[in-house]
Each structure stands twice: as C-alpha cells, then as structure tokens.
Amino acid sequence: SERGELSPGQTVVEASSGSFAVALAIACSRSHHPLILCMPATVPTERQKYLSQLGAKIVLSNYVYGRKGVEKRAMEAVNKTGGYYLNYFANDLNPEFHRRVTGPAIVRATDGQLDAIVVGVGSGGTVTGVGEYAKAWLPDVKIIAVEPYESQALSGGYTGHHNIPGLGAGFVPENYNPYIVDSIIAVPSSHANATARELLYTDAIPASPSGGAVLMAARQLMTDRPEFSRVLCVIAGKTVYE
C-alpha cells in the first residue's frame, strides 16, 4: 500500500500456506484488508484452521494440479473480488526484504563468525536475500538450502506430496538464486515433524515442521562436515504439526 499498488480495503490474494501466509494474515488483519489464501487441499487441517482464525479465507486446490492449480484458484479469486495478487514467489520485494533486514541482522548478531547458514526453501526469498547479503560480506560462508525429501524440485528430482508446510512448492521459484547455494539437503516430512516436536520439548521453541527440517539438515551437515562448528539455522513459523 505504501507504493500505491493496494487500495484501502482492497482484498489481498496469495498462494501460500507457510510462515509468509501467517505473517500476511496478521498484517492484513491489522490493516483491514480482507485476505484470501489459496493452497493445496493437502495442507494440514491444523494449518488451515490456524490461518482461518487469523482472519484469512481459505481456498483449496486439488493437489494433482500442483502449483498451477493453486495459481488458477488465486487468479479466479482476483477476478471475482478485484483483489491484489502479491505473487511472492516472483515478487522481488520478497528477497529484497531479506537482503535489507534478515541478512544484515544475521551478520551483525554473529559478528560474521559463521561457517554455514541453513535455510528452508519455499518461495526462495529468504535463502536468496540472506545468501546474497551474507556472501557479499562473508565470502567463505556456505549457504545450505533445505527442501522436502518427497519433493526435490531444487535438486532436479521427483516432486510429490509432503507434510512440511512452507517448503517444497514442487517447482523452482523465480526468486530462488541457485548461484549462491552451495548445497541442498532433502529432509523427510516425518523427520522434520519429529525434530520440530523435539525442539519444543527440549528447548521450549515452538518451531514449525519447516523449522524442524532446517534443524535436521543442520545436524546432517555438521555430521558430514565436522569442521563446520558455527552453523546458523533460519527457523520460520510456529508449531502446527501434521
């Protein structure tokens, strides 16, 4: 709305079910913009209920139609309501925020003493923005991308259903910059959910399954590369398990 692209009270439409959807629902509620979130019907019921409680209207698409099906639902919602489609998978404001805010915060908080940064990939905005900034200041830092084992689009592998909301869209997002990613680690949904629960019980951190996937990937990285003793995990979202 600051750029004049969103009118007062205009409906906002987005194809998302992850941590961005949560943040967007809160922002729309506070700014009095109706929100329609389009997502596959396979998104956990708990996640759908949580987003509904935050004020979003949920529109579901059959999973077999993939991302195209979700985007079709989003465009139908735009045409029906006159809404504004953010399209954060291709919107450069997404990685730009992380270049300006998240990346600098990480470098400052750690004094640049990092071997690797582990980031889950949904829209690709976080890993791109954080990665580009971090590598500009810390040329030796390794950027590790995390995706679901069941949906390995980033690795060029099979894509299918998984239970890690916010990760693994089933395609390579426009916002994803593969040139700053040093390695990709795939984590099974069951391991991601189990690790998120473990983090809650042991450290009282209510991480989402995507956060569990990131932590699991970091463990694997530090096992495979014991010389990496300073690894930072970017954990997004809150507890909503399958």
Named regions from a protein language model:
Residues 6-41, 113-126, 210, 231-235:
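A short, small-residue-rich loop immediately preceding and capping a beta-strand
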Residues 13, 20-77, 154-172, 241:
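Active-site-proximal loop->helix
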Residues 1-10, 21, 102-113, 217-220:
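Short internal alpha-helix immediately C-terminal to a glycine-rich phosphate-binding loop
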